[in-house]
Amino acid sequence: MKAFDLADKLIEKTKSVFNSFFDRFSDNTITYFCVGLCCALFIAGGVYCLNYEYYIYALIPVVLFGILFVIKQFKNTFLFIALLTPLAVNMSFKEVAISIPSEPILILVFLLFLWERFFTGRYEGKVFSHPISVAVIINLVWTLITCFTSEDMLVSFKYLLSQLWFIIPCFYLPIVLFKNTRKIDAFVGFYSLSLCIVICIATANFASHGFAFNFAHYSMQPFYNDHTAYGAAIALLIPPVAYYLIYGKELGFGKGKMIFVITLLVILITGFVLSYSRAAWVSLCAAFGVWVLVKSNIKLKTLIYCGLVMCVVVAFSWGRIMGAFEKNDQDSSGNMAEHISSITNISTDASNVERLNRWACALDMFKERPVFGCGPGMYTFLYGAYQKSYNLSIISTDSGDLGSTHSEYLRPLSEQGLIGLLTNTAVFVVTFVIGIRAYRRTASKLLANLALFATMGLTTYYVHGFLNQFLETDKLAVPFWGLTAVVAAIDLYATKKEKQAEKDNEKQLLNSEK
């Protein structure tokens, strides 16, 4: 006890000495001194790093500024992420690849969100009870369960963690932010602006190579790995930007804003066409089909029944469809008509044949472990053993080290079993249904159409997800979950037609009484 008392006295004595010293100076003097000391340390550190060629440490001030910005502007950080993501570049540090600067910021926001939710309680609890949120949580819970049955638990838990730092900052954080609809405008504007910068750079690269078709696959590097992810991102943004063009005047946009929106849309369409992404082209056609059906005032139940009937028809006609596809020998090319025709070539087109190879591996993995799957994130490491010689393409590797399933639906099927497929698909279906419901029920015409066009943007990825898999990357996760948050926020916070009608009736009664 005497030792503790002595320590307390020593601490108090030290405090009094420091206080008496600093009391001699004004607050401004102390501030200037601290700022000057920090500047001196940064300069000294910079000189040291330059002398010894530790150039990476020159980013420390930028990192510190980013951390300070995220902490001070926590609620608006998602808009900052939207601005940075298209311009982010993948960098490898030893065996770890990370997208700089977007992913470090996402991780920081993820940690700060957990702190704010669990230690301060500053978050609206009703968000967690919204149908889309419930579907997301169920999917994450099943992912957690399958982590314990995984072939490699460490890999699976890393995969789950990476999904959390996409979903929480890009879905749960912006839902509350989007109560202010101007923040939705800012999100779409920031992401589209950065994406258009990438498109301009990619188009310039493409032009410098004489618009050679083979270079179309790589002209967007280092910002996007290949043309498919690039095309998918553009397809996601075209419907929301088109909304601002169609309803800009009603939103009160002046000439300057309208010119800005038109410029964005023209650049997006140019990049979309020059991406030569067949899956993206098909997905945008599907989104337009949704718009036609919804504007035709067809009931939601009818749409769902039609979808189910189409699935049944395709299932029973699968043999004939595949037979027709096998007769197509048109390979992908720079000619638009030929490139579109090559979509159904499953006999000689290397990309399509390799996609079928990956799908066959995923189905075989599911058959082996139908309940829990091989574990989240494990497909990449295991699919090589399931390859059949007759399924291989000219771009296949014997070791099977080229990556993903090329499907947002077969990935959870192979990694998390049948329940994984159902919970993952449920997120898409529930969001689509809620988006159409929000369009039908929202009192504000502008917000109703915003919900519809956001749903159309998401539809492009639901369709694209049959052929590719990109939600494990920040490039697609940020706009995808951001638009999902737009749909949820409008459904959650916008005034419904029924409530608006009640308010109007009350006003009429009050006026009649007067």
Please place each PLM-identified region on the residue numbering.
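Loop-to-helix entry and N-terminal half of a specific, functionally important transmembrane alpha helix
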Residues: F260-V266, G403-S407, G435-L467
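Membrane-interface micro-motifs in multi-pass membrane enzymes
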Residues: Y52-I56, V96-I105, K158-S162, F223-L237, ...
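Long extracytoplasmic/lumenal interhelical loops at the membrane interface
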Residues: N214-A216, Q221, N345-A360, E368, ...
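Transmembrane signal-anchor hairpin modules in multi-pass inner-membrane enzymes, especially those
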Residues: M1-L144, V155, K179-G189, L245-I259, ...
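Membrane helix-loop boundary segments at the extracytoplasmic
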Residues: L83-K94, Y409-Q416, A448-A489
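Hydrophobic alpha-helical transmembrane segments
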Residues: L418-V430
